[in-house]
UniProtKB/Swiss-Prot annotation:
GO terms for cellular component: extracellular space. It comes from Solanum lycopersicum. Residues 29-146 form the SCP domain. GO terms for biological process: defense response; sexual reproduction. Disulfide bonds join 65-135, 108-114, 130-144. This is Pathogenesis-related protein 1A1.
Length: 175
């Protein structure tokens, strides 16, 4: 009797925890939406077409894990790390660029990059698709695509409502 109660409890535990586990798409989406929520930007939705585009490109990078943009029609962030990188880690790397973003001048600090961060929180980018691949080298490559794309010069980050809701944008991005 005790063993059947134990088995029933164990099965219930497994079912409960497996139902609570997030899928990779939920991990990417939740990490992005948490970063956006912190600065007052609405949530994104997952787009299977963007995810397929991202997966196709990630598969192309599996041989070299090269941090080379796809030059596609979408906004895009790339990340790579060894030996592990997950959705939360990639989005954290991009979100951490916030420290170098100056709201008053609407620019990145000299010599720093913040374009990944601005793409994550770009208000008009409302659809997201991401993919992850383990490269032949053992590194992990992640790409996220955004639609509509963000980071347009003269309109970069200009509609974010954290400190300056109605300011003109003049963010200078590195070439």
């Amino acid at each position: 009797m005790k063993s059947s109660i134990f088995v029933a409890c164990f099965i219930t535990f497994i079912i409960f925890h497996s139902s609570q586990a997030q899928t990779p798409r939920e991990n990417f989406l939740n990490a992005h939406n948490a970063a956006r929520r912190r600065v007052g930007v609405g949530p994104m939705t997952w787009d299977d077409g963007l995810a397929a585009y991202a997966q196709n490109y990630a598969n192309q990078r599996a041989d070299d894990c090269g941090m080379i943009h796809s030059d596609g029609p979408y906004g895009e962030n790339l990340a790579a790390a060894f030996p592990q990188l997950n959705a939360a880690g990639a989005v954290k790397m991009w979100d951490d660029e916030k420290q170098w973003y100056d709201y008053n001048s609407n620019t990145c600090a000299p010599g720093k990059v913040c374009g990944h961060y601005t793409q994550v929180v770009w208000r008009k980018s409302v659809r997201l698709g991401c993919a992850r691949v383990r490269c032949n080298s053992g590194w992990v490559f992640i790409t996220c695509n955004y639609d509509p794309p963000g980071n347009y010069i003269d309109n970069v980050y200009g509609d974010l409502e954290e400190q300056k809701p109605d300011f003109d944008s003049k963010l200078e991005l590195p070439n």
